[in-house]
């Protein structure tokens, strides 16, 4: 269980970044350093931990990609296999987030590991990740590189899960 939690935390983009954020810094322009202070180097160079997801697979639903492997990473052994797509934004912390993309419209049969089972649908599982966007501070004149951090929730697909289809009455 702990391995799955650690794996999902890694994919969500849990990065350790040291930023000097003033208390109550979620609104513009209170985030900006005073004129005597230089902007922290971290604000100018956003760094994020290097996360290497498994190799992305094909972007279409092919029968070959709709197989559950017997070994390998979690995303390829699942009955709702998925691949990862990189979402990079240089003005966001973390800069790199990986989204899961379901490889099959239906779930892979547990009996065969290769045939799709139309009784289950493969759907993404989402999480709202807290991210920070770097924005120029309002009211600052000149060519100073001063930035404010704007906190937002960002929807990230973590994995794909097998669910029963919804029945419309």
UniProtKB/Swiss-Prot annotation:
Its main location: secreted. The keyword Secreted applies. GO terms for biological process: eosinophil differentiation; inflammatory response; inflammatory response to antigenic stimulus; positive regulation of transcription by RNA polymerase II; response to fungus; response to nematode. Residues 1-16 form the signal peptide. GO terms for cellular component: extracellular space. Disulfide bonds join 102-160, 107-162. Residues 61-70 have a biased composition (Basic and acidic residues). InterPro entries: Cystine-knot_cytokine (IPR029034), IL-17_fam (IPR010345). It comes from the Eukaryota. Pfam families: IL17. Glycans are attached at residue 128. Transmembrane segments: none annotated. Residues 47-70 are annotated as: Disordered. Keywords: Cytokine, Disulfide bond, Glycoprotein, Secreted, Signal. GO terms for molecular function: cytokine activity; interleukin-17E receptor binding. Disruption phenotype: Mice display mitigated inflammatory responses and Th2 responses in house dust mite/HDM-induced asthma model. It is found in: Secreted. Belongs to the IL-17 family. Cytokine produced by various cells such as eosinophils, T-helper type 2 (Th2) cells or epithelial cells that plays a role in internal safety of adaptive immune responses by regulating cytokine production. Promotes and augments T-helper type 2 responses locally or systemically. Exerts its activity via its receptor composed of IL17RA and IL17RB for signal transduction. In turn, stimulates the JAK2-STAT5A pathway and promotes the secretion of type-2 associated cytokines including IL4, IL9 and IL13. This is Interleukin-25. It comes from Mus musculus. The gene is Il25.
